[in-house]
């Protein structure tokens, strides 16, 4: 990657690997090509990592992943001296083991810090010099100046505030920000089709059902956070395996699909339970269970909605 990449050509090439996200792709490209660091704010499973990986591959630069949590100390982020060698040789540059921040700076890569606001304050403060000066000094190891293509890309989940840290103005003032929300239904159907060979043996009708029930988790009143599109993908994959075991050859024409007692709807309920019950997060004030919520959503799709559509 050069310091002034052709962002139009990059956008066109990267877009061929994505379903939707053209607008977000343009904004991310514009920010990183302008030399800016960036925080992406959105729930898991919205394509943030896919976008960054595609851009990094297109530009031929490495992508370093770090998970933000209470265990991410400054030493784990920046690096540390090898204790065994220190005992023999004392502290020196030779026995310093660089962490992902220094590796990204030295190699001109993207440092992707997930769950940015879960990292401790002292760890986040170590980023200030890298963000402001593109240079960091490590005691007894010297200074590292970032290669021009180095960028910090952070991510945050706005739907989950448990165990998070309020970011200081000194950090947020040095970052651009982009909200990345769930995609629309058509885009999610396209993603699931792509990842499941158009629904496999059960066909595209299963894909539509899976996407519908999965999206319904995001608006259920008892849930603090619903499932990403990964839930719909897993519904389809699990349902196809169940169908093979149970001898359900296809998903159905309109008659059997609307009959909640037929094999296909029951199969979808079982697949939903496996795929969604661990992905959805109950509201703290809720007195229900994940399995009950899944069953309610299934009933909305296969019992209540078809009944409402019946004439008379």
Task: Please provide the spans of the model-predicted regions.
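Short, conserved alpha-helical segments within structured domains
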Residues: 47-48, 206, 227-231, 264, ...
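Phosphate/oxyanion-binding loops and surfaces in catalytic or ligand/nucleic-acid-binding neighborhoods
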Residues: 84, 239-242, 274-279
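Short flexible/disordered coil segments
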Residues: 127, 131-134, 214, 218, ...
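Short acidic/histidine-centered micro-motifs embedded in hydrophobic/aromatic stretches
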Residues: 130, 209-213, 271
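A general alpha-helix detector
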Residues: 174, 187-191, 216, 234-238, ...
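Conserved AAA+ ATPase small/helical "lid" subdomain
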Residues: 199-257
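C-terminal engagement/docking regions of AAA+ P-loop ATPases
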Residues: 249-312
């Amino acid at each position: 990657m050069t310091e002034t990449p052709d962002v139009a050509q990059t956008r066109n090439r990267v877009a061929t690997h994505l379903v939707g996200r053209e607008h977000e792709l343009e904004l991310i490209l514009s920010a990183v090509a302008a030399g800016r660091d960036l925080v992406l704010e959105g729930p898991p499973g919205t394509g943030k990592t896919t976008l960054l990986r595609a851009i990094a591959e297109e530009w031929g630069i490495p992508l370093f992943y770090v998970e933000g949590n209470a265990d991410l100390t400054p030493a784990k982020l920046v690096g540390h001296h090898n204790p065994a060698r220190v005992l023999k040789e004392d502290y020196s540059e030779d026995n310093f083991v660089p962490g992902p921040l220094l590796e990204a700076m030295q190699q001109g890569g993207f440092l992707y810090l997930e769950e940015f606001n879960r990292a401790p304050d002292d760890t986040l403060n170590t980023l200030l010099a890298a963000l402001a000066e593109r240079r960091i000094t490590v005691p007894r190891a010297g200074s590292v100046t970032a290669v021009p293509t180095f960028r910090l890309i952070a991510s945050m989940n706005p739907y989950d505030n448990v165990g998070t840290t309020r970011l200081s103005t000194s950090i947020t003032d040095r970052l651009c920000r982009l909200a990345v929300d769930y995609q629309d239904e058509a885009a999610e159907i396209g993603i699931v089709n792509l990842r499941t060979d158009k629904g496999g043996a059960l066909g595209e009708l299963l894909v539509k059902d899976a996407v519908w029930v999965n999206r319904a988790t995001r608006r259920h009143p008892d849930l603090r956070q619903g499932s990403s599109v990964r839930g719909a993908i897993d519904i389809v994959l699990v349902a196809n395996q169940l169908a093979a075991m149970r001898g359900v050859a296809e998903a159905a024409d309109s008659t059997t699909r609307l009959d909640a007692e037929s094999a296909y709807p029951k199969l979808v309920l079982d697949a939903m339970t496996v795929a969604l019950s661990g992905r959805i997060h109950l509201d703290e004030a809720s007195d229900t269970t994940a399995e009950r919520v899944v069953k309610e959503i299934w009933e909305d799709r296969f019992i209540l909605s078809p009944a409402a559509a019946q004439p008379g």
